[in-house]
Design a protein with these regions (language model features):
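Non-heme di-metal
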Residues: 2-167
Length: 167
């Protein structure tokens, strides 16, 4: 499969996508599609981040977060389907436009960087709750809230990883 082509009205980079979803309070199907791509890309971002350390405990925590990010992408795909937006499956890394060569951020694996990343994950629960509250569909809202609860787990894992690096 080839890399998905993004509609010109959608964010074109992962940085633009993160900024976009952070501002949305009542998501559209297009916003959910952006979220599918961001969540799917985040699996790869966590795997790439894990390459920056040789600490097996930190690697395991980062990989766990990455696996759950892909689960989040699949749940958002389910939201799109439930809301009548058709099929929009989470793409494999090589097909995700937000992972195009050189288009994604990479930061050194330090306790400070992991704590900063954790703040974003903790904010994810509030974002998903806002999105869930705006949806007039109980099944879709429940899927959003499930992702939100796991964002807090991601933040806690990142804090654990920071503590492991601090020894």
């Amino acid at each position: 499969m080839a890399t998905l082509a993004l509609d010109t009205d959608l964010p074109q980079t992962i940085a633009e996508a993160f900024a976009h979803i952070g501002k949305v309070t009542a998501p559209t199907i297009a916003d959910f599609k952006v979220m599918v791509l961001v969540e799917a890309a985040s699996e790869t971002l966590y795997r790439r981040t894990a390459e920056g350390t040789d600490n097996p405990g930190v690697i395991a925590l980062l990989h766990a977060n990455g696996r759950e990010e892909m689960k989040h992408a699949r749940r958002v795909s389910d939201v799109i389907r439930v809301l009548g937006g058709g099929d929009f499956p989470a793409p494999a890394a090589q097909d995700n436009p937000y992972l195009a060569a050189g288009s994604f951020p990479f930061a050194p694996v330090t306790p400070e960087a992991l704590r900063k990343l954790s703040a974003g994950e903790f904010g994810g629960e509030a974002l998903y709750e806002t999105w869930a509250a705006s949806i007039d569909n109980a099944e879709a809202a429940a899927l959003r809230r499930a992702n939100g609860r796991e964002e807090t787990d991601h933040g806690n894992r990142l804090l654990q990883a920071a503590a492991l690096l601090e020894g």
